[in-house]
């Protein structure tokens, strides 16, 4: 799960620099964490980044990982992302 998250964040960061400052990245992370967003909705959001079946499968697997988490874990991921956005390393962006 961690590897998939890193790969998705790396791919999206190529599209726009975040720190937060990138509404697209923030929206994707929010939709990734949100258990109310289905895998179909999630794929529609990321359609412009999907080139092949391998990417589609990776996106499905990433979303499924988050759908299988408890509310507490999802809440902790939100806190973690906010800590990253607020970190001094992201001030550079």
From Swiss-Prot:
One GO cellular component, as annotated: extracellular space
Protein location: Secreted
Cysteines engaged in disulfide bonds, as pairs = none
* Tissue localization of expression: Mammary gland specific. Over-expressed in breast cancer.
GO term, biological process aspect, one: androgen receptor signaling pathway
Report keywords, A-Z: Glycoprotein, Secreted, Signal
Q: Residues of the signal sequence?
A: 1-18
Q: What is its main location?
A: secreted
Q: Where on this protein are sugars attached?
A: 53, 68
Q: Which family does it belong to?
A: Belongs to the secretoglobin family. Lipophilin subfamily.
Q: What is this protein called?
A: Mammaglobin-A
Organism, by scientific name, is Homo sapiens
């Amino acid at each position: 799960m961690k590897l998939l998250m890193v790969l998705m964040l790396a791919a999206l960061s190529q599209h726009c620099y975040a720190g937060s400052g990138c509404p697209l990245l923030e929206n994707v992370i929010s939709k990734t964490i949100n258990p109310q967003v289905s895998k179909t909705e999630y794929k529609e959001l990321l359609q412009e980044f999907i080139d092949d079946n391998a990417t589609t499968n990776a996106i499905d697997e990433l979303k499924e990982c988050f759908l299988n988490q408890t509310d507490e874990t999802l809440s902790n991921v939100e806190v973690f992302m906010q800590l990253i956005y607020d970190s001094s390393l992201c001030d550079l962006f």
